[in-house]
């Protein structure tokens, strides 16, 4: 498995990243915990060292499952998780991080994303709190997900963005217009979600496929 540097950080992430949305059980049909644990073990055996999760994936269930599966190998892995909208106020950022660390059985998070921009909390509050936690060593890298270019520029007024996570695939290429060039110019890493078009690009769907 190839490894790449994550933007300007010292983190080395695998070229393929294991996602865990389905492991939360509330989207995409769900998955049995045993199957999820086996999938994580299979990823490790094939050289994947980076795992992406979030509180909203089963209200913490995917984080808890991942934390248990990575016991004993935590120091060899890169864990990505995300701050949900309810935890973006200044006084909620650190508790939100600490709750995620507890579920993941770790005392630091390698990459901590703002999952979605808030409609009510000024980004200055969230970014200032995240920068403090990064300075304290509790976060290795700060990311933003589902941000527009203007929202990224506003966030950068108050801190660092090490990585972005937009939806991006051969079918969904809107970031080519402005976000991707900006990220490249500023050495901001890009970890896309849904790179296989939520299954459409896997080759499993043939002409005449019936969607239900």
Question: Where do the protein language model's features map onto the residues?
Answer:
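A short, structured active-site edge motif that brings together acidic residues
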Residues: 76-88, 111-115
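Short, acidic/polar
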Residues: 30-43, 89-104, 148-154
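Conserved, mostly hydrophobic/aromatic
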Residues: 6, 18, 36, 51, ...
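CE4/NodB-like, metal-dependent polysaccharide N-deacetylase domain
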Residues: 93-113, 132-136, 157
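N-terminal binding-site loop/beta-alpha segment at the start of enzyme catalytic domains
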Residues: 1-77
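Acidic (Asp/Glu)-rich catalytic clusters
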Residues: 8, 67-75, 98-105, 156-158
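Short, well-ordered coil/turn segments that N-cap beta-strands
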Residues: 11-16, 47-49, 74-77, 106-110, ...
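Beta/alpha (TIM)-barrel catalytic core signal, keyed to glycine-rich beta->alpha loops juxtaposed to Asp/Glu
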Residues: 117-212
